């Protein structure tokens, strides 16, 4: 190839500079929008042609070249045979180095009117421009097509003709800028060395962001095809019909240069071979343009067309080649418990377009949009950072004493500290024992003790101590006694004493229910059915814990069923209380309340008798009918 061709290639480099290589912020570190290096996409790949000179047998061919005054030189003729390297003119010759092999070319068979040259790529590439250097006269008509689906469908890039209107019915871009047809590269001169140039970034695309959807539609290709539709003769060819037939009826091309780059959406500056692709063995393949991007900006895919697995917190975008903005993918906040996440547009919109990442398959017993909490059955170990694989520990709840999730057989605990939710009456961090005052650990929890204090957690038997005295099994049978005291018992004034402990030494007058008028005349504040639970010796007085089982009457104080304290006032110098209240027994008690303190008082004016249903009915009748 001559100096003209070399200058043409240098000019092609300026086209590159005006195209993708002019992206703002291109740097080796790809800090902003970036693009891989440009190169000849035909290098290392197979170019196809319909025919080849000498494909089946040796052929004779001739060609003209003109002088500077356009007069013809003597034609030169030679032989071609595709089977012999020194006589072959194969399609691969169009893709070798124009500088190292300037005298190599492809040539079609003789007498061919239509020919096709095609480049098939193994992936999507960005195509920027085409340079075709002809050895034969340029065609009178040709079409440049591209495919973006590996040859399934084709679209025209440009039509070339000496007369666009007559040949294709199209306007000429020499007359109307931007027209799809041109007559600029269809002159038969020069008879050899004529070029055809197409720039994919011609107006109106040359001012666009090179990674916008509009420009991608223009630049992306998987296949490129040139259809040579009409030959034309060199104008200096002689027309002497008496001469022997000359062999000029063929197409011949020195170079077929397809300039482009790996297609990476502005997110890579280097590419590697596509998996499984094997380059054609030919000179110059060291400079081959590969098709798989080495993605930056937290992107992934052969063309950096989506975000990396853990970087989907915002929607993927191509880089902006006009401003240089990289539009990096952003990491999802998965707290170290997920390997991937996905973008959810609903989450994105709900957050005000701030965060749309949802973590996938949370690991280490976590769950949630960000794997931000321990899943049911596990709790947060505050001694470990939450990003640690063992930050969520399994709940250790007792299977019998702990509650379970509704419609679930799995026990759970407080995810913040591991405390288990216990069944009624059950205690312990693991819910593995009865609370104090409860017994009978089982499937339904624990039952309340029938005592004022604690009881045996297994049997429910009341447990006595020197301060809380449970006498359920120790009190003597109730016997009516008279009001005649036994000889005095010497004791220190400061010493407290429980009448219940020494009830046998107290002689109290037996009470009977007299007439209704006398009962009503006492104007009792309360009338209760109670069960005596225990007595507490306070030193200066006695407190009796009872369980109120029924409220027959209450006045100013609101009295409810349940545990309550009675305060006996009858305190002799021997420490006896009357009337006697024996633990474990049920009584009907009518007494007065201390308005100032709210205490329920029991004294000699109180009415106390063992509970009988008949007694209860009789007192209720008196309260309703007589005590008005």
From Swiss-Prot:
It is found in: Secreted, Extracellular space, Extracellular matrix, Basement membrane. One of its GO terms (cellular component) is laminin complex. SUPFAM superfamilies: EGF/Laminin, TIMP-like. Residues 506-627 form the NTR domain. Residues 1-18 form the signal peptide. Pfam families: EGF_laminin, EGF_LMN_ATRN, Laminin_N, NTR. The keyword Acyltransferase does not apply. Glycans are attached at residues 56, 163, 353, 483. One of its GO terms (biological process) is axon guidance. CDD domains: EGF_Lam, NTR_netrin-4_like. Disulfide bonds join 262-271, 264-293, 295-304, 307-329, 332-341, 334-359, 362-371, 374-392, 395-413, 397-420, 422-431, 434-446, 506-576, 520-627. Its main location: secreted. Gene3D superfamilies: 2.40.50.120, Galactose-binding domain-like, Laminin. One of its GO terms (molecular function) is laminin-1 binding. Expressed in kidney, spleen, mammary gland, aorta, heart, ovary, prostate and fetal spleen. May play an important role in neural, kidney and vascular development. Promotes neurite elongation from olfactory bulb explants. This is Netrin-4.
